[in-house]
Regions:
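Thiol/selenol-based redox catalytic cores and closely related redox-interacting motifs
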Residues: 52-146
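Short secondary-structure boundary micro-motifs
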Residues: 1-2, 6-7, 17, 49-52, ...
């Protein structure tokens, strides 16, 4: 499980999401959030900028993404994703994460599971949403309809 780091003494000029540049799943969602946040967040790989934050252990950058704000506040794992979404104007996910311990627990464990199975979830993401993160296709609706029809037909 990733460690929740709360603060860095090496704050950036603007919010920065630090992610794993070797992860296709991470790159897919980084591209999506970069489009949605419209320049409000800088996106950098930990391979590029880990040395800029010497008080955050490299192993923690490898375990989870980090959103680091100009005041030094650090958001980790799923909350770094929710905070990115927050910057795009959808504040509900970050609020749920900070307000409800059960949502935080499920998010943290879900994130940890996905982090350990990135290849599988990257394939699943592309099957359900398409290959282009800037123009998502909602194939999952079609798959759901097929399942509903098959279940109805069998019963």
């Amino acid at each position: 499980m990733f460690k929740k780091i709360e603060h860095t003494n090496y704050s950036p000029i603007q919010p920065v999401l630090v992610w794993d540049g070797d992860c296709g799943f991470c790159k897919f969602w980084k591209t999506r959030w970069e489009l949605k946040t419209k320049g409000k967040i800088e996106f950098k790989t930990y391979q590029e900028v880990a040395n800029n934050f010497p008080d955050i252990p490299l192993k923690e950058f490898k375990k989870s993404s980090k959103l680091i704000e100009p005041n030094g506040k650090v958001y980790n794992g799923p909350d770094s994703a929710y905070r990115c979404i927050y910057y795009s104007g959808n504040k509900i996910w970050h609020k749920l994460y900070t307000k409800y311990k059960i949502f935080q627990h499920l998010s943290d464990h879900g994130y940890n599971h996905i982090a350990k199975n990135r290849s599988f979830y990257f394939k699943l993401t592309k099957i359900l949403l398409g290959n282009n993160p800037t123009s998502l296709k909602h194939f999952w609706i079609f798959y759901l309809l097929i399942i509903i029809v098959l279940v109805y037909w069998v019963l």
